[in-house]
Structures are given as C-alpha cells and as structure tokens.
Amino acid sequence: MTKLNVGCGWRNFGQEWTHIDGGDYDHLDHKDIFLQEHEPSSVDVIYSSHMFEYLDREEAVGLLSAWYRVLKPGGILRLAVPDFSTMSWLYQEGKITLDQILGPLYGKMQMGEEVVYHKTVYDYASLSKLLTECGFRDVFEYEWRETDHAEHDDHSQAYIPHMDKDNGVLISLNVEAKK
C-alpha cells in the first residue's frame, strides 16, 4: 500500500509512509508536494495535516488536481486544516479570546530563509465544495482517533484548551474524500 504524508514537516510516521515536504528534514523521501515523480493512479492514501491552508485557492485547485491524478480509483485523500467555523463559534460565544485563535488562523512557518503564512481558511462547506469541484467524492469529516496515523500527534489533533483531547473542542477540520 502506498501512503504519502504530504507537508509532513518534522513528523516521521515511519517506514510505511512516504514523507514529502518542501523543508529540509532528514527523514524526507521527496520534496515535491505536487507529486510529479509519482505515476498516475499509483497511490492509495494521501494525508496532509495543516499544510493546505498555506496555499491560496488557485494553488489549492492545482494541488488537488495533482493529487487526484496520482490517487488510485477509490484512493483516499485525508486533509486537516484549521476549522474556521469552530473557532469563529468559540470566539462569538465568548469561550476563547482573539489571541487564542490568531495562531491557528494566521499561522506562519519558517522555510529556510522564507517565512510563509496561511493564505486562506476553510469551513466544512467550502472545503467539501472545493474537493467535489476537483473530482473527489464521498466527502466527510473523519475522526482522527480512527485513523492509522492516530498515534502521531499532529495538528489534526488540535484542541482548545491546548491538548485537552478529552474535554476540549477540536479546532482542526479533518476531512476525507475518495477519488
């Protein structure tokens, strides 16, 4: 089974995953997030946690098209992005302060000499619409605890209060779709 972790950063999911990121990490197998080195219909699973929001909408369509190309029919795409809807609700209800959501919504990352920032936000409706427009089907919100990567603590497991996975509110929008 071919499983790709695209935008993995420093997180190493082990030998059963191919690690892809534009950064400079020892465990990387490839750097091209557009997966040009992969044959069409050759990948079973693409997972990307909190990388997709660094793209604007046009870049997102291009990337989804590239990922669609390499996924096998019935292949799975699993995306995790900051959940704009949940964070907005928490803020409007007075459950969190603006300072608590600035990082998740407007995050930044150092990529060598360059600093990159989030370029967009998503709620379930906007992300599922985008996925459907790019050819994906059967879009739904997945439960991170039920995945084969649940033991790897990444931002798909982001909660407010921070790390309160039992009583907190999940602020990551975790969506799965099929080719």
Predicted regions and their residues:
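Conserved class I S-adenosyl-L-methionine
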Residues: 2-9
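A conserved beta-strand element that flanks and buttresses the S-adenosyl-L-methionine
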Residues: 47
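Local beta-strand N-terminus motif with an aromatic residue
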Residues: 43-44
